[in-house]
Amino acid sequence: MIIKALAIVSLCLASIQASKVGAPQLPKKHLVCYYDSASFVKEGLGKLVIDELEPALQFCDYLVYGYAGIERDSHKAVSLNQQLDLDLGKGLYRTVTRLKRKYPNVKILLSVGGDKDIELDKDAKELPNKYLELLESPTGRTRFVNTVYSLVKTYGFDGLDVAWQFPKNKPKKVHSGIGSLWKGFKKVFSGDSIVDEKSEEHKEQFTALLRDVKNAFRPDNLLLSTTVLPNVNSSLFYDIPAVVNYLDFVNLGTFDFFTPQRNPEVADYAAPIYELSERNPEFNVAAQVKYWLRNNCPASKINVGVATYGRPWKLTDDSGDTGVPPVKDVKDEAPVGGNTQVPGIYSWPEVCALLPNQNNAYLKGANAPLIKVQDPAKRFGSYAYRAADKKGDNGIWVSFEDPDTAADKAGYVRTENLGGVALFDLSYDDFRGLCTNEKYPILRAIKYRLTN
């Protein structure tokens, strides 16, 4: 009897073990970390050098180094800061790719475009979009492919991220009642103007460009991804069923739906997960993801973009004192952050310093803490505000990402079984640990939620 009982127990244990072995394993969620090298040349607390970047790599599966660009006339892929990137200067390209020796599981990609390839010449605004001009030129596409391949191979990158600078949607106000009638993506029109009269041609040409890059990369097993920049209409420029064949993954810029630059008179949630009432139904993470899924992009290739910063507006005496968005009668004149040094954007440590803490609890006026408003439903995100005083001064309203809301988006990625999260940008996370003495808190929160 004892032997028989032991045999039964053994069979049960074997059956349990077999069921574990045969159980389907969910694919690993990826974390793509962007590093804008422009932060390397900043002065002050916003300067992120490689030694301070390195601790982040234990949490990243991919590091995307930004940004390269293209020459207008030659269509060559080039460094946007040769003194910083190339061997003749500080040699940051090689410094970054050599990090693979210490972190062999991290793949390091070079990104092209990213809304950072800005021509400063006073006549540049009158010139055509050089990214569209390149697409229209077969010779230009070939030259780009050859030169970008050379950059990637010469400096030891594992692949390329194509953050193509397509024309952006024009800001469009959606008034009460209109939001429910506004269906799908606009195929040609955005707002009251045509974004690109030749969008169908450019869509085909962009597909051809990605195909050619992938063909050049394939013998070396180099990676190829694309970043859909914020407020670029995917239906205009991405032939999704075609391009996914050439891409290892897609990073969606699912943030900056509202910014002070685009919406100087109305403050609202910059990156909600789900649709809000009486808003444009496409201005949220879920709508962007669903569009790519509906067009046959594998869920495993989609990475949801999460920002590490906030978008601030200045409140006026006409903005009211409730802070409830959308907030009208605002201005795009919030004070510039001392760390970021960029109008209309606050890094997470800059936002954190504005929230109630022991250093500002009793301060008044321009130094008084903001009132933080969280979203218990975890659908839209957090905001904070300080109403303007009787003189119309010191008012501010910020929509921002923090460790909690970033983790909520990682949770959304897990629920929808997507590929992972793309973090924009390491330089705006609290890489110095100024807020809570923990470095990279947003990055850590995302990684924890993706893996637990």
From Swiss-Prot:
Task: Identify the InterPro entries for this entry.
Answer: Chitinase_II/V-like_cat (IPR011583), Chitinase_insertion_sf (IPR029070), Glyco_hydro18_cat (IPR001223), Glycoside_hydrolase_SF (IPR017853), Glycosyl_Hydrlase_18 (IPR050314), IDGF (IPR015520)
The record's listing under SUPFAM superfamilies reads: (Trans)glycosidases, Chitinase insertion domain
Pfam families in UniProt: Glyco_hydro_18
Gene Ontology molecular-function annotations: chitin binding; imaginal disc growth factor receptor binding
Start and end residues of each GH18 domain: 29-452
* Glycan-carrying positions: 233
Q: Which family does it belong to?
A: Belongs to the glycosyl hydrolase 18 family. IDGF subfamily.
**Which named protein is this?**
Imaginal disk growth factor 6
Organism annotation: Drosophila melanogaster (Fruit fly)
